[in-house]
């Protein structure tokens, strides 16, 4: 029996429908980027290996040097040990000082740069205006004849008066010198004479000066002394008061002696009472005309008793 006949007899076999399955996308690996990252890691590891080998060699060399120093310290004497220790410490100190010096130089350079920046900030900004002086313009003006210098009339008169006064004074001195003997007077150191001679010489000199000062002049000389006020009239006679005595007699009479004995009264001298004693207010008795004061708390002999309860 063929398949076709069987299919026609029994009917067609229904085929099961397959569900569409979700296809999982395969991961796309970028082999180039992965290889680059692995190559970089490999290079870093190689560099670390090289550094580690260098440090290992350095530590080995230091270990050998320390063993040698230790052996020298063990084998050497006390003085050699001290010298080695001092030398080692000096090396450490010098290395430390070199590091400090390098840091100090760096700090100085940095502060210098900062100060330069501050000074540049503080400097005034150049203004856009032109600070140069403008060129001087030459003025072609006509020449004018100037007026000659003239002094004021008042100043000229004062100068002439001063000159005239100087001439007059010189003439007066020359006339004084020639008036006595017709010859110039010489200054001589003369000793002190009597008062009468001094007064006579003074009067003669004053008369000669008055005669010499009466020389006629064309112009009035300047006034060297301020004009005094006008003289007042004759003063009226005033009646003189009688002179007052300097000391007054005391108003209180002297006390009489109290004892009857004449001998005692003659020997005892009683001082008279002062006049100022009567003016002392504390010695005066209170007058009965005024109202008396009410006694206080501390008055004696009867104390103050308050009767108002």
From Swiss-Prot:
Component of cell cycle checkpoints, which ensures chromosome segregation during meiosis and mitosis. During meiotic prophase, it is involved in the regulation of the synapsis checkpoint, which monitors whether homologous chromosomes have synapsed, and the DNA damage response. Plays a central role in chromosome cohesion during cell division by preventing premature dissociation of cohesin complex after prophase, when most of cohesin complex dissociates from chromosomes arms. Keywords: Cell cycle, Cell division, Centromere, Chromosome, Chromosome partition, Coiled coil, Nucleus. Expressed in gonads. InterPro entries: Shugoshin_N. Its main location: nucleus. Residues 184-193 have a biased composition (Basic residues). GO terms for cellular component: chromosome, centromeric region; nucleus. This is Shugoshin. GO terms for biological process: cell division; chromosome segregation. Residues 167-178 have a biased composition (Low complexity). The keyword Signal does not apply. Disruption phenotype: Viable with 100% of viable progeny. Defects in the regulation of the synapsis checkpoint and DNA damage response in meiosis with an increased rate of synaptonemal complex disassembly in late pachytene meiotic nuclei and an increased number of rad-51 positive and hus-1 positive nuclei in meiotic prophase. Reduces the number of apoptotic nuclei in the syp-1 mutant background, which is indicative of inactivation of the synapsis checkpoint or the DNA damage response. RNAi-mediated knockdown results in chromosome segregation defects during meiosis and mitosis. Residues 165-195, 210-309 are annotated as: Disordered. Residues 42-77 form a coiled coil. Belongs to the shugoshin family. It is found in: Nucleus; Chromosome, Centromere; Chromosome. Disulfide bonds: none annotated. The lineage of its organism: Eukaryota, Metazoa, Ecdysozoa, Nematoda, Chromadorea.
